[in-house]
Amino acid sequence: MKKTIKYSILGVIAGAMLASCETEPETGLVRLTHYATFDLIGGEIYSVPVGGSYSEPGVVCMEGTEDISDKVKTTIYDISGQVVNSIKTDEITFYNVEYSAVNVDGFSSSATRTVFIYNPDVKGSCAGKFDVDMDNTTYNGTPIIEAATKRGYKTSAEVTITELCPGIFYTNDFLAGWYEQMRGIGASYAMYGYFKLNPDNTIDLMYSHVNGWDDGLDYIQNGKWDEETGTLSYESGYAGQIFINPVLKRK
């Protein structure tokens, strides 16, 4: 089973309502059904230094006043959405741990904990809203302003980068808005994903995905964050033929 994860600090998904009503088809009478609710011991966000140890904190699951914690199913997803057997702490990444349960009437609900494996030596942050530097960003070796103008595309774009925990970031578009904003073909063609910031302010790709084509980047290289100028830059390769080297300026 694969789930596409997009900025997946999810919290409690279903269980916002403690109970609801349903009608018995045989009698037309209305009775109360209690959805399972979850109390994540240790919270919805759990951080472990790389190389440290992780022990499942557990969850308390209630159906009304009845404790049904022993009926909870636990599923672990890695950063790409693949189901895995356990959480490993030997590399910087994150996992989503989904807790689900079905109540006596067959209604399911779930909650999710995000477990970050992070580098405590990272002190900087490249989070924020960025303008794409249209003159210095290149598309297949050409300034992207020229490539966009030649094709009649929009000649500006912006990117938002969100810090998930120290050193781990989510971007809404690794491709600097080329398809979604400049070409204007929609949000399904933004290359969202995750990258890590290292203590020396270089960056490395963790995961990327574009829903419209169901694939990701070939690579990111020579990535760096300049705290003084607020500039993030890297070289990216996509589909073996698209080479976009973004230069992003923090607003």
Predicted features and spans:
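Solvent-exposed, low-complexity, repeat-rich "mucin-like" stalks and linkers
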Residues: 34-67, 155-157, 165
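N-terminal helix-cap/turn-to-beta initiation motif at the start of protein domains
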Residues: 88-92, 114-131
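Serine/threonine-rich, repeat-prone extracellular segments and beta-strand-based repeat modules
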Residues: 66-108, 117-118
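Short, exposed coil/turn segments at beta-strand boundaries within extracellular/luminal domains
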Residues: 104-111, 240-242
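Bacterial Sec-dependent N-terminal signal peptides
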Residues: 4-11, 15-44, 122, 251
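Ser/Thr/Gly/Pro-rich, low-complexity flexible regions
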Residues: 121-251
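Well-ordered beta-strand positions in beta-sheet-rich domains
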Residues: 26, 45, 110-114, 156-158, ...
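Residue-level recognition of well-ordered beta-strand positions that form the cores
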Residues: 60, 98-102, 114-116, 131, ...
